[in-house]
Amino acid sequence: MSRINKIMSGDKDITEDVLSVITITGITPDILDRFSSLLVMQIYTAFMSRTEDPFRICHEILCLEGKPLHGGSHTKPPKMFNRKPYLKGLWHKHYQGVGVPSMAQNLSNSLQKYGIPYLQEILEESERTGVTHYLTEEDAKKIAHQVVTEHYMRRSSDRKMTGHWIIYTTFEEKNYYLSLGKHTDDEAELRKMIEISCSYEFQFLSSILEKLPE
C-alpha cells in the first residue's frame, strides 16, 4: 500500500491513474513508498504533457535500487551536490530527457570529448601527401554517422550520458526520492520547493539539508 492515500482532481479521485503511471515502469510498492508526493505529481504531469518519459526516469531509480529491468544505467554515476549550499547533503542521478535539447547537449559533449577521427585522418593524410582532399557526399555521410550515431552510442556505453536530475537523499541505508530538476534550475528555488513539499513527509530531511545562513 502506497503512503500516498488519495489524489483528487476536483471531485474526481485520480489516485489510481497517477500511481499507475509510475508502477507500470516496474517501480514496486516498497520503492514507491519512498517517493515524495512532489515527485509523484512531477512524473505524472510530465507524462500527461508529454514533456518527459516516466520509463527513463524510473529506470534510473530502479538502477539506484539495484533492480534494473532492462540493463544498467547509461547516465553518469550518482553524485552529491557540493558546489552551492542550497542542496548540499542531497544527491542527484541523471536521467536522459526527451526531445532535441537533451540530445543536442549529449552530442555536443561527445563531440568535445571524442572529436571527429574520420575528418582528422583526412586532414593528416592531406598534410602528409600534400594533396588537397575535397570532401565528398560520402565523406559527409561518414562524418555525420560518426558524430551522431557512433559518438552517441559510445557515450551511452561509457555511462557518460547527461540529462536532467533525480534529486534524492539517503536515510538509514535507503534512498528517498524527492524531486526532479534541471541544470538550468535555480538551486535556491529547488531547495525551497523541496523543503516546503517534502519535509513534512520525510521529517529526517531537516537534519540532512545544510543549514543556510540567516
Regions found by a protein language model. Name each.
Residues M1-G163, N175-Y176, H183-E214:
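Basic, Lys/Arg-enriched alpha-helical interface segments
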